[in-house]
From Swiss-Prot:
Function summary: Involved in oxygen transport from gills to the various peripheral tissues.
Domain (Globin): residue spans on this chain: 3-148
Alphabetized GO MF terms: haptoglobin binding; heme binding; metal ion binding; organic acid binding; oxygen binding; oxygen carrier activity; peroxidase activity
Key words of the record: Heme, Iron, Metal-binding, Oxygen transport, Transport
One GO location term (cellular component): haptoglobin-hemoglobin complex
Family: Belongs to the globin family.
Subunit and interaction comment: Heterotetramer of two alpha chains and two beta chains.
Protein name: Hemoglobin subunit beta
Length: 148
Protein backbone atom coordinates (compact mmCIF):
# COMPACT_ATOMS: atom_id res chain seq x y z
CA UNK A 1 0.00 0.00 0.00
CA UNK A 2 1.21 3.47 -0.84
CA UNK A 3 1.36 6.00 1.97
CA UNK A 4 -0.08 9.39 0.97
CA UNK A 5 0.52 12.51 3.02
CA UNK A 6 -2.32 14.96 3.60
CA UNK A 7 -0.51 17.44 1.31
CA UNK A 8 -0.27 14.84 -1.47
CA UNK A 9 -3.96 13.99 -1.14
CA UNK A 10 -4.79 17.68 -1.34
CA UNK A 11 -2.61 18.22 -4.42
CA UNK A 12 -4.14 15.22 -6.23
CA UNK A 13 -7.66 16.39 -5.41
CA UNK A 14 -6.81 19.94 -6.47
CA UNK A 15 -5.33 18.89 -9.82
CA UNK A 16 -8.18 16.47 -10.42
CA UNK A 17 -10.69 19.23 -9.71
CA UNK A 18 -9.17 21.34 -12.48
CA UNK A 19 -9.21 18.59 -15.11
CA UNK A 20 -11.88 18.52 -17.79
CA UNK A 21 -11.81 14.88 -19.01
CA UNK A 22 -13.55 15.91 -22.25
CA UNK A 23 -10.54 18.10 -23.08
CA UNK A 24 -7.55 16.50 -21.37
CA UNK A 25 -8.33 12.87 -22.24
CA UNK A 26 -8.58 13.28 -26.02
CA UNK A 27 -5.43 15.44 -26.12
CA UNK A 28 -3.39 13.00 -24.02
CA UNK A 29 -4.44 9.94 -26.04
CA UNK A 30 -3.89 11.76 -29.33
CA UNK A 31 -0.41 12.74 -28.16
CA UNK A 32 0.33 9.09 -27.34
CA UNK A 33 -0.79 7.93 -30.79
CA UNK A 34 1.16 10.67 -32.59
CA UNK A 35 4.41 10.56 -30.60
CA UNK A 36 4.46 6.78 -30.19
CA UNK A 37 2.86 5.54 -33.43
CA UNK A 38 3.42 1.85 -32.60
CA UNK A 39 0.69 2.24 -29.95
CA UNK A 40 -1.82 2.65 -32.79
CA UNK A 41 -1.90 -1.13 -33.20
CA UNK A 42 -4.22 -1.36 -30.20
CA UNK A 43 -6.69 0.98 -31.87
CA UNK A 44 -7.08 -0.51 -35.34
CA UNK A 45 -10.86 -0.26 -35.07
CA UNK A 46 -10.63 3.52 -34.69
CA UNK A 47 -10.32 4.14 -38.43
CA UNK A 48 -7.96 6.72 -39.89
CA UNK A 49 -4.89 7.23 -37.69
CA UNK A 50 -2.57 8.00 -40.61
CA UNK A 51 -1.32 11.40 -39.46
CA UNK A 52 -1.57 13.92 -36.63
CA UNK A 53 -4.53 15.77 -38.14
CA UNK A 54 -6.47 12.54 -38.60
CA UNK A 55 -5.75 11.45 -35.03
CA UNK A 56 -6.65 14.83 -33.54
CA UNK A 57 -9.92 14.87 -35.47
CA UNK A 58 -10.85 11.25 -34.83
CA UNK A 59 -14.02 10.99 -32.70
CA UNK A 60 -13.12 7.48 -31.49
CA UNK A 61 -9.77 8.73 -30.19
CA UNK A 62 -11.56 11.57 -28.41
CA UNK A 63 -14.17 9.25 -26.91
CA UNK A 64 -11.60 6.74 -25.65
CA UNK A 65 -9.44 9.54 -24.26
CA UNK A 66 -12.40 10.61 -22.13
CA UNK A 67 -12.84 7.01 -20.94
CA UNK A 68 -9.15 6.75 -20.02
CA UNK A 69 -9.13 9.95 -17.98
CA UNK A 70 -12.48 9.00 -16.50
CA UNK A 71 -10.86 5.79 -15.32
CA UNK A 72 -8.37 7.82 -13.31
CA UNK A 73 -11.31 9.16 -11.32
CA UNK A 74 -11.55 5.74 -9.68
CA UNK A 75 -7.91 5.94 -8.61
CA UNK A 76 -8.41 9.46 -7.23
CA UNK A 77 -11.41 8.29 -5.22
CA UNK A 78 -9.64 5.14 -3.96
CA UNK A 79 -6.10 6.33 -3.28
CA UNK A 80 -5.67 3.77 -0.52
CA UNK A 81 -6.56 0.84 -2.78
CA UNK A 82 -5.63 1.70 -6.37
CA UNK A 83 -4.40 -1.85 -7.05
CA UNK A 84 -7.66 -3.39 -5.94
CA UNK A 85 -9.67 -0.77 -7.77
CA UNK A 86 -7.82 -1.46 -11.01
CA UNK A 87 -7.63 -5.27 -10.71
CA UNK A 88 -10.31 -6.01 -13.32
CA UNK A 89 -9.07 -3.27 -15.64
CA UNK A 90 -5.55 -4.68 -15.37
CA UNK A 91 -6.84 -8.15 -16.16
CA UNK A 92 -8.75 -6.84 -19.19
CA UNK A 93 -5.68 -5.09 -20.61
CA UNK A 94 -3.45 -8.09 -19.86
CA UNK A 95 -5.58 -11.10 -20.74
CA UNK A 96 -7.98 -9.84 -23.39
CA UNK A 97 -6.43 -6.78 -25.02
CA UNK A 98 -2.77 -7.87 -24.63
CA UNK A 99 -1.56 -4.31 -24.16
CA UNK A 100 2.16 -3.99 -23.49
CA UNK A 101 2.24 -2.52 -19.96
CA UNK A 102 5.04 -0.12 -20.91
CA UNK A 103 2.40 1.76 -22.88
CA UNK A 104 0.69 2.79 -19.64
CA UNK A 105 3.84 4.69 -18.69
CA UNK A 106 3.91 6.37 -22.09
CA UNK A 107 0.28 7.41 -21.71
CA UNK A 108 0.95 8.71 -18.20
CA UNK A 109 3.82 10.80 -19.58
CA UNK A 110 1.56 12.16 -22.32
CA UNK A 111 -1.07 13.02 -19.73
CA UNK A 112 1.50 14.84 -17.60
CA UNK A 113 2.73 16.84 -20.60
CA UNK A 114 -0.85 17.69 -21.55
CA UNK A 115 -1.59 18.93 -18.03
CA UNK A 116 1.63 20.93 -17.81
CA UNK A 117 0.87 22.60 -21.15
CA UNK A 118 -2.73 23.30 -20.13
CA UNK A 119 -2.07 24.70 -16.67
CA UNK A 120 1.38 26.24 -17.08
CA UNK A 121 4.18 26.57 -14.54
CA UNK A 122 2.23 28.73 -12.10
CA UNK A 123 -0.27 25.91 -11.46
CA UNK A 124 1.67 22.80 -12.49
CA UNK A 125 4.69 23.61 -10.34
CA UNK A 126 7.57 21.17 -9.80
CA UNK A 127 6.02 20.27 -6.43
CA UNK A 128 2.64 19.55 -8.04
CA UNK A 129 4.40 17.62 -10.80
CA UNK A 130 6.17 15.48 -8.20
CA UNK A 131 2.91 14.47 -6.50
CA UNK A 132 1.09 13.96 -9.80
CA UNK A 133 3.94 11.74 -11.01
CA UNK A 134 3.72 9.64 -7.85
CA UNK A 135 -0.04 9.28 -8.38
CA UNK A 136 0.36 8.23 -12.01
CA UNK A 137 3.15 5.80 -11.10
CA UNK A 138 0.79 4.13 -8.63
CA UNK A 139 -1.96 3.94 -11.27
CA UNK A 140 0.45 2.53 -13.88
CA UNK A 141 1.75 -0.08 -11.43
CA UNK A 142 -1.82 -1.09 -10.59
CA UNK A 143 -2.70 -1.45 -14.28
CA UNK A 144 0.33 -3.67 -14.79
CA UNK A 145 -0.33 -5.81 -11.72
CA UNK A 146 -2.14 -8.65 -13.54
CA UNK A 147 0.61 -9.14 -16.13
CA UNK A 148 2.62 -12.35 -15.88
Amino acid sequence: MVXWTDXERHVIADVWGKINPDEIGPHALARLLIVYPWTQRYFSSFGNLSNAAAILGNPKVAAHGKVVVGGLDKAVKHLDNVKGTYAKLSELHSEKLHVDPSNFTLLADCLTITLAAKFGPSVFTPEVHEVWQKFLNVAVAALGKQYH
